[in-house]
């Protein structure tokens, strides 16, 4: 009986253990990573109105001055169905009746999709989180855990090459940074 109780306690602890962090660059195939590392820095400080990423009609358009890697939808097939934990920033898309965000893009840097340019599609994850999360500050980083899917998603803000049904979403704490 003791051994059974110990095994159950051990399994319960393992079930609650956090997944190791997945790096955003792991979502890109090696050739995209290399192209991204070789391109010049992009300013994320300009307002969208001054950007070449939006046409006069307000719709997204590609900037011909940027390399193709900035629009890459190439994915890493081995990640399809894999349980991951990604750290990133939310871009809210839908909320429930209480104002909690239930659908959002998770992006690797703050201000993405709000200040341009948006990340490449293979650097955006559409997160479904039916439990909802109160987002008081979209510039505060989150940890999102769940099964990653290779899934092409498009809306007026951006295109994503991945989606996730999150099982846990939480704010990054000071202890996480130690």
Mark where each language-model region is.
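Hydrophobic h-region of N-terminal signal peptides that target proteins for export
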Residues: 8-17
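Extended interaction regions within the primary functional domain
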Residues: 1, 12, 160-164
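Sec-dependent signal peptide recognition
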Residues: 1-7
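OB-fold and OB-like single-stranded nucleic-acid-recognition modules
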Residues: 17-178
């Amino acid at each position: 009986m003791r051994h059974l109780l110990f095994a159950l306690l051990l399994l319960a602890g393992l079930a609650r253990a956090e997944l190791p962090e997945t790096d955003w660059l792991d979502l890109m195939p090696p050739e995209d990573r290399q192209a991204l590392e070789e391109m010049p820095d992009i300013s994320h400080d300009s307002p969208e109105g001054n950007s070449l990423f939006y046409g006069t009609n307000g719709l997204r358009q590609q900037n011909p001055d940027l390399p193709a890697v900035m629009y890459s939808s190439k994915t890493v097939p081995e990640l399809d169905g894999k349980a991951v934990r990604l750290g990133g920033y939310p871009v809210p898309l839908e909320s429930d009746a209480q104002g909690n965000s239930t659908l959002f893009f998770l992006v690797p840097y703050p201000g993405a999709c709000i200040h341009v340019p948006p990340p490449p599609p293979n650097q955006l994850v559409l997160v479904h989180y039916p439990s909802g999360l109160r987002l008081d500050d979209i510039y505060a980083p989150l940890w999102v855990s769940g099964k990653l899917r290779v899934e092409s998603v498009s809306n007026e803000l951006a295109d994503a090459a991945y989606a996730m049904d999150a099982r846990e979403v939480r704010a990054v704490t000071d202890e996480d940074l130690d």
